[in-house]
Design a protein with these regions (language model features):
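Glycine/Thr-rich phosphate-binding loops that ligate phosphate moieties of nucleotide
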Residues: 290
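Interface amphipathic segments
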Residues: 1-185, 192-287
Length: 294
């Protein structure tokens, strides 16, 4: 049983002898998903093992490794991995196609990835493209460090209309229902428990601010830094099409301990739409014109 799913282990042959392991058709499956392993594991760089995957959920790998609750990759991986000299100085590479690749429950698209093991840095170097709604794919290059205590990542992302839903996980203390797309260059790096973003993204998105129960749409460039997001005179609108301008910041430390200051120049915008609640001393529907400070 793996992650509450029953897998079938098929008959196979595994022989351990004189510092080497010969694997003949080690095969386990669940419905049409499977992992199949053939080859030899040893210190000899000429001895190679081959791993074939079909529709294996990436979430299994991260759950087994107990990497972090702050980053959650999902998607069904199909492809082949090769490894040689495993017991001394491993050389490993893989080519995978991952359907419905997602980060923190935000679907990013179809991922085509080439990866290889970097012995010196104890990480997986990757070169990947993500195909979604844009004719031009998003590109991801860099390295993932799966082994503790270094576990983390260092990725350069060239986003083309990339789904921004994954940010909802980090902003859930103040906002929800994040919808939209981003285009730009971003550096995504740090330990899994302390991730950072750095770059600039042209954003066409909306989100709901919990305390106001109001959706705002943003169509402008947002600047990202390890300390937070900066908004420089960006164009915003409410869901009824009334527009305004916003300056301010959303500060955080590794997406935690959020604090913010927004200065909004509103033109008859819906700035609050709350109902009676024991959590708030006031409620109502408010349209505002002028300067608003949040």
């Amino acid at each position: 049983i793996l992650n509450d799913t029953l897998w079938k282990i098929h008959p196979s042959q595994v022989v351990v002898d004189s510092g080497r392991v010969d694997v003949n058709n080690f095969y386990f499956s669940h419905q049409d998903r499977y992992v199949r392993i053939n080859g030899r594991l040893s210190e000899n760089p000429k001895d190679t093992v081959k791993v074939d995957l079909k529709d294996i959920n990436m979430g299994y790998v991260f759950d087994i490794a107990s990497i972090s609750d702050d980053v959650n990759f999902e998607g069904d991986a199909t492809g082949t991995a090769y490894a040689s000299g495993v017991f001394k100085k491993p050389i490993m590479n893989t080519r995978l196609f991952i359907k419905n690749f997602s980060l923190n429950h935000g679907r990013l698209g179809e991922l085509d990835i080439y990866g290889e093991w970097d012995n010196e840095n104890r990480g997986i170097r990757l070169d990947a493209s993500i195909q979604d709604i844009s004719p031009s794919p998003s590109r991801v290059t860099g390295i993932i460090y799966p082994l503790k205590p270094e576990s983390g990542l260092d990725l350069n992302i060239e986003a083309n209309e990339l789904n921004l839903k994954f940010l909802e996980h980090y902003m859930k203390s103040i906002a929800n229902d994040i919808k939209g797309r981003g285009t730009g260059k971003v550096h995504f790096y740090g330990k899994f428990k302390g991730l950072n973003l750095d770059g600039a993204v042209m954003t066409d998105a909306s989100m709901n601010f919990d305390i106001l129960n109001t959706h705002f749409a943003v169509k402008d460039t947002i600047h990202l830094a390890p300390t937070g997001l900066t908004f420089n005179n960006i164009h915003i609108s409410d869901m009824e099409g009334h527009s305004g301008r916003m300056n301010g910041y959303l500060h955080f430390q590794h997406f935690k301990n959020l604090n913010y200051r927004f200065e909004i120049q509103a033109n008859n915008m819906l700035v609050m739409n709350t109902k009676e609640s024991t959590d708030m001393p006031f409620y109502g529907t408010v349209y505002g014109t002028g300067n608003v400070l949040l």
